Amino acid sequence: MLRISRVHIDYQKNPVGIAEMPQFGWEIVSDKRNVIQKAYTLQISKNPEFTEFVYDSGRVVSGKSAHLIPESGKLESATKYFVRVKADDGGDETPWSETAYFITGLTEGEVWSAPFVSAETEEADREVSKGTYVRGTFTVKKPVKEAYAMTTGLGLYNFFLNGEKVGKDEMTPGWTSYRRHLLYQTYEITDFLKEGDNVAGAMLAPGWYKGVMGLTKARNNYGDQTGFAMELRIRYEDGNEEQILTDESWKGCDSPIVFSEIYHGEIYDAGFEVLGWASKAEIPEGNWHQISVVPFDTNVIRAQSGARVQVIDEIPAKRIFTTPKGEQVLDFGQNMAGRIRVTATGKPGDVIWLKCFEVLDSEGNVYLDNLRAARAEMKYTFAKEGTITWYPRFTYMGFQYAQILSCPGEIKAENFAACTMHSEMEETGNITCSNPLLNQLHHNYLWGLKSNFLDVPTDCPQRDERLGWTGDAQIFCRTACYLMNTYTFYRKWLHDVEVDQTSEGGVPHVVPNIEEGKTDGNWLLSQGPHSAAAWADVAVIAPWTLYLMYGDTKILEIQYNSMKGWIEFMREHSEDYIWNYKLQFGDWVALDAEEGSYFGATPNDLTCTAYFAYSTGLFVKIAKVLKKEEAADYEDLYAHIVKKFQETFFDAEGNMTAQTQTAHIVALYFGLTPNAYREKTVKRLTELLEKENGHLVTGFVGTPYFCHALSQNGCVKEAYDLLLKEDFPSWLYQVKQGATTIWEHWDGLKPDGSMWSADMNSFNHYAYGAIGEWMYRVMGGMEADESAPGFQHVIYTPKIGGNLKFVDTTYHSVYGENRLKWQVDEGCVTMFVQVPVNTTAKIQLDGAKKVLDTDGLAFEKKQGYMEAEAGSGEYTIRYRQ
């Protein structure tokens, strides 16, 4: 049976907010082997009956089932389109797929026209962090066929129609480089409207826009007034259309949110509630006043079609306990990012007061020091007697625990639930194996992603930072792509990388660059506010990684000028191809740093030049993929950088001038080691590892590639040994200490229960979770092929080791489910492989001496392994090592 199991539209299911003709793709399943699509038919219609075609491809002879963009068909704004597809393999034909849909926002040629209205009209409002309401009324005079809303805000907003919150999105409009890039959200609102009087409204709060944020703790980073803008498109049954905008007739007043900030939490006083504020046509009671219109450059407003922040999971409190100091504490059993929903019964003046935190101290008491200045609290004051359920709307915290400072009535664990929040992305990868510690490690870096991919890839979710550090996002990118469908998330963020680049092409340390123009007085930024190696290289490495994982050249086309700008910045500021520029983080927080320093021992000119070469080499590949004539020029540049690196950082005997683990790792993994010295470099790396009793002492630059540098050079055992270390410093040390996420420091929590430091000690910092990439690519054996990216041709090449009895790895690509499970029994390996329809695979049996069961595949003997090509289907192979 041949059928289409799902349809992708711009990498999503039924996306809303499409601004241009999207990409289409589909997954085909079959119970046969070697199935390749020969033709497809794609239809787009304005109705689900498919009688009002916008596009009908007819039967197209093509094997393409991903990244397809129709060359004809014009989309209208604020319109719902229905999609279906069928395909055949030259013999069997699928039925029509289930009908999918997408909804457009403003399409090409239309510009944003709704003004921003603000209730913050007084000068004093500029310096406070309160919440406000804005509202307006309109009349629907006849039956509605369909209606859509496009909304955005300066600050954070929730949108209401006739008293109901519209959509599941939270923390809208998200965090972008607001002056250059602001997103609007699109909603289908037909069912929210009624004939007669209607009320539209929004709750607003400062958020990232005007709250206290960043390393410099500045207020009003993007503006000093919150605001809301709305455009409704209503189509009536009689064929007419009406447009309704925010305007000067709207009213505003303060809301019960008397304080709200990202770092510090939210305070809600129910005594200031205004009943019917978003549902009564007549002005309800309250201090309503005329709004002000906030000037804003509407040219930077763009549609958001995916990766919106939502409440994804709910975790009930596991227990309530009392610390040795007498503190009452909730334990949710998992470190996470989000908020707490609480149900309580009280009387006027009673207060619910919770303070969120990550870990207990060595005595088992509340530990808040690593939050630094972040208060991370939530407060609710009762206005009347009764039972309420409440949660903060415009903030989030990083926590496993919450201290109950005040709560009326009987306090029971069942009255508290943690609502985890992150950008909505489908989970695509999973690994389970015979070692439960490795299973927990996988859990930990997955939850590191869940906790920090909250609209931007932040470093941490708990302290007074939570910034889009480019280095963290770069080193974790490929791991993230295995774990979840991050294409839309990264595409949105990479646009901010581009718009925040300097005129020379330099890349800020954090994106969005909230620190722009605020370097004075900050010990770090005053040394250089942008363009650190490994951090800024995200401009090239992330688009390339997305291309490898999803097979889409569009991201390379979109980001090409950004990538080129970064390469040219490095070229301009290098001296004879050695690159080093102002503030460099180097091998950040490496354990070979001098006492009291965060900067590792590997010299900056080495790490900088290594990344200069690596990014330039990737850019050469990108230019060739896009068939750019200038590819040859950059190939020449790359050759010069590599030559200079080898002349500078290797001596005449082939020794590296820097005797650190990281120096050898990047030289090997980035392909910078002279061929004549490769074996010697590998040997020296293993010696440096042995010198530390088999432990790493690497930081942000060396850690992500350590196991790769070993396993790619014949040291698979050493790579597994490194991964499986259980004492400090190691990945599994954290697991053994009870971690449920990845820590910022290898010894954030020491064996005696004491802390690494108070000022920089996050327990939810995904960067070192980059080991996940090695676990998927090497331990799990699931590797993308550069010549057929996006897993159109997958290379199954697991390295057996680590005394593991089995490893079961799945990855859901744009073509379907890939699976590889290997199991070892007394020297005999059984490998189960699943290859999706319309893809092919290369299966490599590492160290195979004899294949006992080929399951119909033709294996050839290679140097150190056996290899066969396979079409789609399931295979079970047995071989002896």
Across the structure, where does each feature detected by a protein language model lie?
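Non-transmembrane amphipathic alpha-helical segments
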Residues: 543, 613-616, 620
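Extracellular/oxidizing-compartment recognition motifs
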Residues: 1-80, 84-463, 471-472, 488-489, ...
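Active-site acid/base region of carbohydrate-active enzymes
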Residues: 156, 229, 247-249, 253, ...
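Alpha-helical support elements that line or immediately flank enzyme active sites
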Residues: 147-151, 161, 339-358, 394, ...
